[in-house]
Amino acid sequence: MRKFLKSAIEYLAKDLDLDKELLEQIQYVVIVLTFEFIKCISVILIAGILGYFKESLIVILSMCFIKPFIGGYHEDSQLKCFIATLIITTSIIMLVTFNKLNLFSIVILNLFSIFSIYNKAPVIDSRFPLTKEHLIKKNKILSVTNSSILFLITLIFFKISWISQTITWTLLIQTLLLFNKYKREDS
């Protein structure tokens, strides 16, 4: 599929007179977005077959809203990434199913997540280096803003507990996964 996408982009771009660097960037973005789309749809379909369509949809949408900006956990292949996403989504759905959070718990967990994201995001992965200072700052602002928006959504939808709790657990788990790649400065 990767070769097909690269060839298709090269074919479409040959009349646009793009330089090699821009063409590579376009290819990278299209390939990543295509694989991410397939992964997300697959996870939602599997969860839907098991009766958790709406929960998995909220998990995936919440992840898409914050994950690109906070960094953190990455796998080294599409299959491993799919399996990890499926396990994370299933775990969040189980947490929502078996643990009921009150308003105080939701506020505390979300504030903890936002505080951690503010202090650690974006976590830079060596395979996906973000080296330009202005991009790092932009991602930090977007990660804090988006996690704060998710927190507000949990408060607005508190009476619809499965939405509020699904977003809260997703934000918390994604925040915990930030520390998977965090390296202490003295190590």
Curated annotation (Swiss-Prot):
Family: Belongs to the AgrB family.
Organism: Clostridium perfringens (strain 13 / Type A)
Regions crossing the membrane: 29-49, 50-70, 81-98, 103-120, 149-169
Enzyme class: hydrolase
Entry keywords, A to Z: Cell membrane, Hydrolase, Membrane, Protease, Quorum sensing, Transmembrane, Transmembrane helix
GO biological process entries: proteolysis; quorum sensing
GO cellular component annotations of the record: plasma membrane
Pfam families listed in its UniProt record: AgrB
Entry's Gene Ontology molecular function annotations: peptidase activity
Stored SMART domains: AgrB (SM00793)
Enzyme Commission code: 3.4.-.-
Membrane topology: Multi-pass membrane protein
Protein name as it appears in the record: Putative AgrB-like protein 1
InterPro entries: AgrB
Localization (cell): Cell membrane
Signal peptide stretch: none
Function in brief: May be involved in the proteolytic processing of a quorum sensing system signal molecule precursor.
